[in-house]
Amino acid sequence: MRTRVKFCGITRREDAIQAIRLGADAIGLVFYPESPRAVSPQQAYQIVRELPPFVTVVGLFVNAASCYLQQILDKVPIDILQFHGEESPEECGYYGRSYIKAIRMAEGVDLPSLARSYESASALLLDAYQAGVPGGTGRAFDWRRIPKNFSKAVILAGGLTPENIAQAVRQVRPYAVDVSGGVERIKGVKDAAKMAAFMRGVDSVN
């Protein structure tokens, strides 16, 4: 099965268009005000309106108030929600949308148990753990910690770069990979050459 690709932390229309030209399946928009990659609803709408059909738009939230999240949904056509905080399964499912739950791979994380708890999730996104940081750490975790034949679709994140992505896909065989900082020039601004190299790395294994 082909591993899908999501470029996250998109803040500019031109980066979104470049991602799609390179063959990305999805883009991620960050609605977490504390992130250097955060976008306003107006920015997000201007990006999304330029996208061609069949591109998945993912909205990333961290412990967002339901009224704030609903305001975003009212203004921006988002296909999938991505939760990066301590949201419960009930909170994730409240909006009646497909959702991804991010799991930070701290010591002792019980993935089979979390898969049961978040049974309604479309996938679990596995990211590196850093205390006090909900994501975008630029660090990788030990991919051997992912159980073989895991019951949920896995989206691999955390410290992925053009240099290690082929190895990551070959070893984990994830449903999808999610990259942000590994293909940036500066935080929030993507590097077209790095994006292209990342896609080549995925395609070399696919």
UniProtKB/Swiss-Prot annotation:
Pathway: Amino-acid biosynthesis; L-tryptophan biosynthesis; L-tryptophan from chorismate: step 3/5. One of its GO terms (biological process) is L-tryptophan biosynthetic process. Keywords: Amino-acid biosynthesis, Aromatic amino acid biosynthesis, Isomerase, Tryptophan biosynthesis. It catalyses: N-(5-phospho-beta-D-ribosyl)anthranilate = 1-(2-carboxyphenylamino)-1-deoxy-D-ribulose 5-phosphate. Its EC number is 5.3.1.24. The keyword DNA repair does not apply. GO terms for molecular function: phosphoribosylanthranilate isomerase activity. SUPFAM superfamilies: Ribulose-phoshate binding barrel. Pfam families: PRAI. Belongs to the TrpF family. PANTHER family: N-(5'-PHOSPHORIBOSYL)ANTHRANILATE ISOMERASE (PTHR42894:SF1). This is N-(5'-phosphoribosyl)anthranilate isomerase. It comes from Nitrosococcus oceani (strain ATCC 19707 / BCRC 17464 / JCM 30415 / NCIMB 11848 / C-107).
